Amino acid sequence: MKERMLTGARPTGKLHLGHYVGALKNQVELQEKYETFYIVSDVHMLTTKSDKQYIDQMYQNTIDMIIDCIGIGMDPNKTTFYLQSNIPEQNNIFCLIQNLIDIKRVEDTPSLREMSKHSKDDTVSLGLVAYPVLKAADIIGIGATMVPVGKDNIDHILVTQEIIKHLIKNMVLIILCQILLHRLIIMLLE
């Protein structure tokens, strides 16, 4: 049985060469090795792109993103594409696990500091602060054991691992996810 991998993107605009080189090319190769789920993270998009113009474009961006992914070689017979907001159970998981992590832990993540720099009025939404916890809900919700990320998102996976450890110790047994950093698998918890 193949390990389960979660990958995806926010439908903030058109995919470009940077997406291909930075992630998609690798994901095409990884779909051969892993049971692959590609999440179109529309809820995550709202944490930084909640203006009407982005919401109005989200539907078309979602369609274009999936078409582009298939066009570059992601096989819908090997990769399950899904829209984050279409899975209500993910929100239930998020509501539970947000109580398992200290807010200071997520406020201190480098990715939050970087993403908050792009705020137009120097404010940070609660949704943006909770971004790593929502990502953890996505990972836990489908039982992903591998998550390909760039260096800028390793802290999200570390938050996920902390939440999973708490769940294993205090609540339920689930599989601990690992970071898949492009071609290098980093085993943080051996």
What are these regions (language model features)?
Residues 2-137:
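N-terminal Rossmann-like or analogous alpha/beta NTP/dinucleotide-binding catalytic cores
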Residues 113-190:
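Active-site cores that bind ATP or allylic diphosphates and position pyrophosphate for catalysis
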